[in-house]
Amino acid sequence: MTKGFVIMAQGDDYVKCAEALKRSIKFVMPDANVTIITTDMLPYGDQAPDTYWKLQNDWQVYEASPYDETIKLEADMYIPRSISHWWDVLKDRDLVVSSTIRNFKQEISDVRLYRRFIDDNNLPDAYNAITYFKKSDTAKRFYEIVRDVFENWEDYKATLKCNPQEIATTDWAYAIACHIMGVENTMLPTFTEMSMVHMKQYINGTPTENWTDSFVYECLPNQVRIQTIPQRYPLHYHVKNFSDKIMKSLI
């Protein structure tokens, strides 16, 4: 069976991030297959032509992936060390959505400020940024539900506790799909290594969402250090121009 990493990247900023992510993957896993899915590669075309945030296209990753087994990663991430052993842990599952995040100290985070929608609706704590799936009936059904959530968000929202102006995000759509299909079929909460360092303001105690303005960091060829701490888990840096520093460090 073929296996590889897939990165969804629509728009120049995300393509730049995806290229940096691909380079970081190949640096620590030289034999890894990596595919960047750009707008022209979407099997159903761009479903959000008038928006910068192309969340509505995410469900197309199932058909767009050229692999039998896929680990989908968000574009604005960095992989600091090999995660090739994940394949052995995940291979017996059809689908696993990450449910764990960490702060820059590498500690599992229990900050819930960004998860009010999840908590108010008793939904699984899904983080779409790292998702494993196998070409299977389970994964196909999952992404059909994700598509349905985006296309019929107003109907879903009418049954949920949320702000009337709440928009459908990929995490919300994944959480709903995980709930419908069952956590036992869609997540692996005990595999906490399948997690990311989430560089959001309140998770890391920074004054603003731009952590690069307040934290000291180093981008070295073999690691990224933040406040002198080496980052050992996938780093979701989210400040898009940080990709330039990653690219320069991996030349």
Predicted features along the sequence, with ranges:
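N-proximal low-complexity "stem/linker" segments adjacent to membrane-targeting elements
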Residues: 1-16
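Short, charged, surface-exposed secondary-structure boundary motifs
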Residues: 19, 44-47, 104-110
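GT-A fold catalytic core of metal-dependent nucleotide-sugar glycosyltransferases
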Residues: 54-108
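A glycosyltransferase accessory/donor-loop signature
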Residues: 39, 120-130, 137-251
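Active-site-proximal specificity loops/subdomain of glycosyltransferases
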Residues: 36-65
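Short amphipathic alpha-helix
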Residues: 20-25, 57
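Conserved catalytic core of nucleotide-sugar-dependent glycosyltransferases
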Residues: 88-149
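Short, acidic, metal-binding catalytic loop of nucleotide-sugar glycosyltransferases
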Residues: 24-32
